Amino acid sequence: MDFLPLFHSLQGRLALVVGGGEVALRKARLLADAGARLRVVAPQIHIELRHLVEQGGGELLERDYQDGDQPGCALIIAATDDEPLNAEVSRAANARGIPVNVVDAPALCSVIFPAIVDRSPLVVAVSSGGDAPVLARLIRAKLETWIPSTYGQLAGLASRFRHRVKELLPDLQQRRVFWENLFQGEIAERVLAGRPAEAERLLEERLAGGLAHIATGEVYLVGAGPGDPDLLTFRALRLMQQADVVLYDRLVAPSILELCRRDAERLYVGKRRAEHAVPQDRINRLLVELASQGKRVLRLKGGDPFIFGRGGEEIDELAARGIPFQVVPGITAASGCAAYAGIPLTHRDHAQSVRFVTGHLKDGTTDLPWQDLVAPGQTLVFYMGLVGLPVICEQLVAHGRSAQTPAALIQQGTTAQQRVFTGTLENLPQLVAEHEVHAPTLVIVGEVVQLRDKLAWFEGAREDA
């Protein structure tokens, strides 16, 4: 290890930046974020750098660097393209014992800047010791996606209660166990779900009760998207990997299910039109029962749980019973499948609105507001419309839509098995029979479908028609 990782307090201390360009500006911003008072020396100073220094009450010295600029500084940055000058700044700083960083010159540095993931007060630094800064930045980019932005709030909560916990738990090992449980439990989850006030209230109650606690479960209603695992949200993935029990249905792709916690109990509650492995009311009760046992329950649903996913029915029961829950939206099939098929749902020349329609109603019929559905300038997207497709096409034409209106079938959209068939309202049912199209299949009706020939970019493993 060539450099020892340390975090340096610069609050209210003087930091010298030699240089006035964009590189100097980037370094100065970091110093200002850390609370440093800036002294910038350069014959010409970038306008944004000038404003940054003035806002922080620092010093602007618009002239050449002088050796007398260094005394009293806690840190020195050389950010010029003048190599002899950078070397001079480094030599003088080392002679005075002042930490110095020379941009893009590791050999002249006594300190180096890492790639930073800032979730203040939680900060993660990644460094290659100056050997591969681009690699360090790539690793930082990965960490940015893995560490929720709300982790800073979680660290702040812990800071505010640190002394009280220490008084209640003087034993170091007991405190360690307490914090480990807190950071992996319901209080932390409230913070990460954007409910910090609720988290603080729960922690207050726990401390007031002498730390005695009965675990309370929670339900995560998570949208798994249309099929491609890369379309999962960060929050969805985090909750999938911490749930104790997973309830999933047939629209959840196996590749997505595999991303759930390995040792989580999995319960299939798959639903198909008019066929239910587990009736909806039983699913609702099961969510309540499992959460009441103190378990973290993941209800994983294809697409978005609030768009033809019956998510509202499931959390209605939870709300009535006082069971904590959170909802994580997913990319709905209309958006995901249309994008992967190269069919924009709206377009200035073809469609100024889009309508999502269920292909069958609660009683199994296809009794829809047909007159509204034939209005011009709109795209129709039918969910669960395969069985009722002949009726849908017939009724749209009967109510005034042209039989030659472009239409598309997207089977298993966004996955490697995606198949797309385009035609018209007149021949769409025939395409289903000819190509043995099966669920899950999305139906899109509208002039935008004709853009697929030009905009298609994703091809599944099977040929389209």
Swiss-Prot record:
Can you state which reaction this protein catalyses? uroporphyrinogen III + 2 S-adenosyl-L-methionine = precorrin-2 + 2 S-adenosyl-L-homocysteine + H(+); precorrin-2 + NAD(+) = sirohydrochlorin + NADH + 2 H(+); siroheme + 2 H(+) = sirohydrochlorin + Fe(2+)
Question: Any keyword Ubl conjugation?
Answer: no
Q: What Enzyme Commission number(s) apply to this enzyme?
A: 2.1.1.107, 1.3.1.76, 4.99.1.4
Annotated coiled-coil positions are none
Q: Name one GO molecular function term.
A: sirohydrochlorin ferrochelatase activity
Q: Which InterPro entries match?
A: 4pyrrol_Mease, 4pyrrol_Methylase_sf, 4pyrrole_Mease_sub1, 4pyrrole_Mease_sub2, CobA/CysG_C, NAD(P)-bd_dom_sf, Siro_Cobalamin_biosynth, Sirohaem_synt_dimer_dom_sf
Annotated region (Uroporphyrinogen-III C-methyltransferase) at 217-465
Q: Which function does this protein serve? A: Then it catalyzes the NAD-dependent ring dehydrogenation of precorrin-2 to yield sirohydrochlorin. Finally, it catalyzes the ferrochelation of sirohydrochlorin to yield siroheme.
Protein name as annotated: Siroheme synthase
State the species of origin.
Pseudomonas aeruginosa (strain UCBPP-PA14)
Source organism phylogeny: Bacteria, Pseudomonadati, Pseudomonadota, Gammaproteobacteria, Pseudomonadales
- Gene label: cysG
